[in-house]
């Protein structure tokens, strides 16, 4: 009963800032669906691509934000969250992944990447130049991902070693999360002992537009990336016994 009351109080407090700021940025021309595996958990992401702007987000986060901010559907989300908490110690797979609450926007026209993120109950906007990892391409190492022939590339990027597979048939310098800068779209990525990402589908028709999502009308504070990482790693910010998922970036 206490758990139910807490969830209701939390969700209703968010409804006080029910969003009006969500807006379309531009039409999309392609959407890549990615499936991620982290420990015993999974998530599903979209890389939605327009002419100038692409966005990367968790489908499950988008659904939670959309339904949770709607007074007509918020109770369904509350019940889902309660069941998830009750099943937390069971061996069932959970919907969970590093930085799953983030919305990332990559603007190729101005060369900037913007990340909308949070640390506990504070919300931040990080703007940086589009990252350019130093890739080593392994021409002799290939694999097929959803029917596309892909070439392997490796890099050490922001504290983690990444191995990715990119497809030159789709000549876009994009990929999941902040991975990109190769002569083809990244369709799979692996960080040993941390995370697996693999494309599950590519959509080309009847696509939603590239959209700035802010259903809760959150007020984001500008912060630089390194200050954010320092703040996010501060254990005093979080309540006791909070289970923390490692961040995508370590440095």
What does each model-found stretch correspond to?
Residues 1-27:
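Bacterial Sec-dependent N-terminal signal peptides
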Residues 21-251:
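Extended soluble regions of mature proteins
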């Amino acid at each position: 009963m206490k758990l139910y009351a807490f969830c209701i109080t939390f969700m209703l407090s968010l409804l006080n800032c029910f969003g009006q700021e969500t807006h379309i940025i531009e039409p999309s021309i392609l959407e890549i669906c990615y499936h991620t595996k982290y420990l015993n958990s999974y998530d599903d992401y979209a890389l939605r691509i327009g002419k100038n702007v692409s966005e990367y987000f968790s489908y499950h986060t988008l659904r939670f934000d959309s339904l949770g901010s709607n007074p007509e559907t918020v109770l369904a989300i509350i019940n889902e969250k309660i069941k998830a908490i009750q099943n937390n110690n069971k061996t069932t797979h959970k919907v969970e992944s590093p930085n799953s609450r983030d919305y990332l926007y990559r603007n190729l026209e101005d060369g900037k990447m913007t990340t909308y993120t949070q640390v506990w109950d504070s919300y931040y906007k990080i703007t940086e130049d589009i990252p350019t990892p130093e890739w080593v391409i392994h021409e002799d190492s290939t694999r097929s991902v959803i029917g596309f022939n892909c070439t392997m590339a490796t890099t050490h990027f922001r504290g983690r070693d990444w191995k990715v597979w990119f497809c030159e048939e789709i000549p876009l310098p994009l990929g999941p999360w902040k991975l990109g800068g190769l002569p083809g779209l990244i369709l799979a990525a692996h960080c040993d002992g941390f995370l697996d990402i693999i494309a599950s589908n590519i959509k080309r028709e009847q696509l939603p537009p590239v959209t700035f999502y802010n259903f809760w009308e959150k007020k984001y504070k500008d912060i630089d990336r390194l200050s954010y990482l320092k703040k996010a790693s501060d254990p005093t910010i979080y309540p006791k016994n909070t289970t923390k998922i490692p961040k995508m970036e370590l440095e």
